[in-house]
Amino acid sequence: MSAQDLGRDAEELADVAAAARAALVSEIDASGAWADDPVWREAFAAVPRHLFVPYYYVGVVGGYERRWGQSPDPAARERWVRGAYADIPLATRLRDGELLSSSSQPSLMAMMLVALEVEDGNRVLEIGAGTGYNAALLAHRLGDDDLVTTVDLEPDITESARQHLAAAGYHPVVVTGDGARGVPERAPFDRIIATCTLRSIPRAWLAQCRPGARILAPLATGLIALAVRDAEHAEGRFLHTPAYFVPLRGATRSEPERAQLGGLPRRARDDELFRFLLALTRGSLDPQEAYVLWEREGQPQRERYGITVSGEHEWAWLDDPEGAYAWALPG
């Protein structure tokens, strides 16, 4: 292929990407995800997601299919770029069939960024660099790369995120380390957002926050929004939406055992809100106790649950932090 042909192909692919990005923005518009803070629309319209996923995997019968932007087949390259703007999570790293890293569903990212309530001049820490796309959205919104720090455990993930960000014209601070420990050398932060699932809130995060800071993180199968009072106290409720992310990895993190659901009615076992309660109370309630509570309280929505952190203690609760239902979370 001549240089002229290569240039024409790149131009055509850029046009496809621009059209696909505009379609994604329109789709998120229609979902109402950023209705409360439409400034995020500009960020999603400007940041080229395809530059953050030079390859990704899509599920097929028997495993995964790899799509990549350097395929010699023009049709395959077009499928890659169109797929990069689908409103779905994209698997970006696998190891022995296990998902290590992904680019989250854009509409969920939009909803989370709105819920983070970012203000001009805020210093933001992202836990889970992933592809770097979310950090780019934050950097674009804030207009200052130095206000954004993103951390991930795997050096190859942070290096590729740094490269993707540079290719898109963004240069936030990318750190390799255990996200549970935060990034103390970049503190204090006004906002912390995690894109990996937690079992409890790391105390290091509170210590690195300014009073009045906000933390948004996946926990159980929901999203908790915490207001930070000081280095030892934070409290907040879950948002309404479900959220499924790769677990936070680190030397001290371990996966909980799966709950045994034998003997429970099928409708409860299959109910997403009941499974949220199971995940939230694992280690405190057995499934039968959780089922009795769930039925007694009218199958509560996520917004009725919350979390309180006070010194060395951390607990989840239903309706009221000081109410009848409270369950300790792992420290």
List the predicted regions and their residue ranges.
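SAM/dcSAM-binding transferase cores
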Residues: 2-20, 222-331
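Short, solvent-exposed coil/turn elements at secondary-structure transition points
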Residues: 58, 178-180, 221, 242
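Conserved, well-structured beta-alpha core segment at the onset of a catalytic domain
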Residues: 5-34, 189-191, 195, 199-202, ...
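Surface-exposed loop/turn and secondary-structure junction residues enriched for glycine/proline
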Residues: 55-56, 84, 88, 93, ...
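Class I SAM-dependent transferase core
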Residues: 2-125, 134, 157, 318, ...
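Generic structural hydrophobic/aromatic packing signal, biased to beta-strands
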Residues: 24, 85, 138, 174, ...
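Conserved nucleotide-cofactor-binding alpha/beta core module
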Residues: 101-218
